């Protein structure tokens, strides 16, 4: 017999459903649930008097071999490039096994996710689930970055470095076969996935190919090592041959040529441009114009996101430290000053909102903050709604188009750029269960639990001597998915196909899985999700004003206050 309850009571029991809205933290952004894959009246939930019990929502006879999942997240609100919807999520063997309706197929109809004796449960009611963030601009300066990044929902690191060397402080590069092998070994117990970038500075292919065969999934070109046209062309020729990505930080000083010369050297080949606005480095003053090229995958680093009253002031000191400059040398100060333009920093926010800039990343400990990639991405979304209004197709109470655009910037798009989207980057069946669970009031700021391959790797946790898990002080701590041998099984290292074919596993110590990064050379900007716009961009060299397709762009105004800020970090 059917039983009717109010929408409010339903929400209290099972969480919001189709058409309901949820405010993201203290921002002006409101998501609206597009569909609900659970069955009204047949929902499952865990706890005393709830449905997941023997003979009810939990099957008591099926074995794991018969398809029972290892873990279920019930009634979750999924926020992903694929949509914003409610569903149960099943996890098995560290992968997403099913998204839909969980329960006991013996007593419930149309079950996609069998729940049984083998199944652990997370109560996803009133919880938002996203894919783990992928940070493509990591300086491997300190292992402490892992925990800091996990605390904001980042589960994959792509970048380079060897520790606190001056080369690493300035450039995201792990140079040469020896360093690449040592860093793969050093990160074998890291609680995040790893992908390394080698040094893309050679006049002949040999030294570059050796680094890729050693396990680098890409090469980085950086002005501090000389962003020459020869280095660009040689790296791209090798990349096209061996299927890896090229990342570039172009020549601020325009010593080796201007922006037009770099574009000519790239010659329509796919490339990932770092901090494309320019404050992080690149052709002054017009590197931002490269974001309009169809073969360019443009990214931002987070110190310029969003544009605030403090952004310009803090950049000078950051530049001096990170790029080994001397404040007593006028030329060094002039070099640093040439990279900082409030006009283009403001436009960067707008280009993110228009889907011209496609990726957000950190530039960890080297002009960026590794624990704020997700947070700052949503701050940009907020200030753009505040200053520019709803996106086309959105409204004051429905920001789904904007939300899908911004979540894609740190999940699926970096995965596509670096050839790992078949494994991570979205909440889809068959992908690694790198999932972040958020309470809506803390969305984008402090996750409830971070799962790595379906295991709890990082979570908020109360006093270990408490009689329950919640007594103060509640702090973030590693959990079982980041301890013991689980550190090697829950996370992976990405390497190119040619490295696997070359037997790189036999040259390394440690038991961590090496998975293939692939298909990086045929992609263009049109393959990126919700962020594929390619307008013609022009920069006035005197005023730094920016035009899109001939129209003057008004950048965001430097904001004085932001959501997701200090009120969340008092304790």
Swiss-Prot record:
* PROSITE patterns (UniProt xref): UREASE_1, UREASE_2, UREASE_3
Per its UniProt record, the required cofactor names are: Ni cation
Q: How is the cofactor bound?
A: Binds 2 nickel ions per subunit.
Residues recorded as binding Ni(2+) 1, renumbered to this chain, are 137, 139, 220, 363
One Gene Ontology MF term: nickel cation binding
N6-carboxylysine PTM positions:
220
Its localization reads: Cytoplasm
Which residues make up the binding site for substrate?
222
Tell me if Hydrolase is a UniProt keyword of this record. Answer: yes
How is the polypeptide modified once translated? Answer: Carboxylation allows a single lysine to coordinate two nickel ions.
Tell me the superkingdom of the source.
Bacteria
Catalytic activity annotation? urea + 2 H2O + H(+) = hydrogencarbonate + 2 NH4(+)
Protein's pathway: Nitrogen metabolism; urea degradation; CO(2) and NH(3) from urea (urease route): step 1/1
UniProt binding sites for Ni(2+) 2: 220, 249, 275
The record's active-site residues are 323
InterPro entries linked to this entry = Amidohydro-rel, Metal-dep_hydrolase_composite, Metal_Hydrolase, Urease_alpha_N_dom, Urease_alpha_subunit, Urease_AS, Urease_asu, Urease_asu_c
**Subunit details:** Heterotrimer of UreA (gamma), UreB (beta) and UreC (alpha) subunits. Three heterotrimers associate to form the active enzyme.
* UniProt protein name: Urease subunit alpha
Top-level taxonomy: Bacteria, Bacillati, Actinomycetota, Actinomycetes, Mycobacteriales
């Amino acid at each position: 017999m059917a039983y009717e309850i109010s929408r409010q009571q339903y929400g209290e029991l099972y969480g919001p459903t189709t058409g309901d809205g949820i405010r993201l933290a203290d921002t002006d952004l409101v998501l609206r649930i597009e569909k609900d894959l659970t069955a009204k009246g047949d929902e499952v939930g865990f706890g005393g008097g709830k449905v997941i019990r023997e003979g009810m929502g939990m099957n008591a006879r099926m074995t794991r071999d018969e398809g029972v999942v290892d873990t279920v997240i019930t009634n979750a609100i999924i926020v992903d490039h694929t949509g914003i919807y409610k569903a149960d999520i099943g996890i098995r063997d560290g992968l997403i096994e099913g998204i839909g309706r969980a329960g006991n197929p013996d007593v419930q109809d149309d079950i996609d996710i069998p729940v049984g004796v083998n199944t652990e449960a997370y109560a996803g009611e009133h919880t938002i689930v996203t894919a783990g963030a992928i940070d493509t601009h990591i300086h491997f300066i300190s292992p402490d970055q892992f925990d800091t990044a996990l605390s904001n929902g980042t589960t994959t690191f792509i970048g380079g470095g060897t520790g606190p060397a001056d080369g690493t402080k300035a450039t995201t590069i792990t140079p040469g076969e020896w360093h690449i092998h040592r860093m793969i070994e050093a990160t074998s117990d890291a609680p995040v996935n790893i992908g390394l970038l080698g040094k893309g500075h050679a006049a002949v292919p040999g030294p570059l190919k050796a680094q890729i065969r050693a396990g680098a999934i890409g090469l980085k070109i950086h002005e501090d090592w000389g962003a020459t046209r020869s280095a660009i062309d040689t790296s791209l020729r090798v990349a096209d041959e061996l299927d890896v990505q090229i990342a570039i930080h172009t020549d601020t000083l325009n010593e080796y040529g201007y922006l037009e010369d770099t574009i000519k050297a790239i010659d329509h080949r796919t490339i990932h441009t770092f901090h494309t606005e320019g404050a992080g480095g690149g052709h002054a003053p017009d590197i931002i114009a490269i974001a309009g090229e169809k073969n360019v995958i443009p990214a931002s680093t987070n110190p310029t996101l969003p544009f605030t009253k403090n952004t310009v002031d803090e950049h000078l000191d950051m530049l001096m430290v990170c790029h080994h400059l001397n404040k007593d040398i006028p030329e060094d100060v002039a070099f640093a000053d040439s990279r900082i333009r409030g006009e283009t920093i403001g436009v960067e926010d707008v280009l993110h909102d228009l889907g011209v800039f496609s990726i957000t990343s950190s530039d960890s400990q080297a002009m960026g903050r590794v624990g704020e990639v997700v947070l700052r991405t949503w701050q940009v979304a907020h200030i753009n709604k505040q200053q520019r209004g709803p996106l086309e197709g959105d409204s004051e109470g429905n920001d789904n188009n904007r939300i899908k655009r911004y979540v894609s910037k740190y999940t699926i798009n970096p995965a596509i750029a670096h050839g790992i989207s078949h494994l991570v980057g979205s909440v889809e069946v068959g992908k690694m269960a790198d999932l972040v669970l958020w309470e809506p009031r803390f969305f984008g700021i402090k996750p409830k639990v971070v799962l790595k391959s379906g295991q709890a790797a990082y979570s908020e946790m109360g006093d270990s001597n408490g009689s329950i898990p919640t007594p103060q002080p509640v702090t973030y701590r590693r959990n079982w998915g980041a301890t013991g041998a689980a550190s090697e099984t829950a996370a992976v290292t990405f390497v190119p196909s040619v490295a696997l074919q070359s037997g790189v596993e036999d040259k390394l110590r440690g038991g961590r899985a090496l998975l293939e990064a692939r298909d990086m050379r045929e992609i263009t900007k049109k393959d990126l999700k919700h962020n594929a716009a390619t307008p013609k961009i022009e920069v006035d060299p005197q005023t730094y004003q920016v035009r899109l397709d001939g129209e003057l762009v008004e950048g965001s105004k430097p904001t004085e206050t932001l959501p997701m800020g200090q009120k969340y970090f008092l304790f």
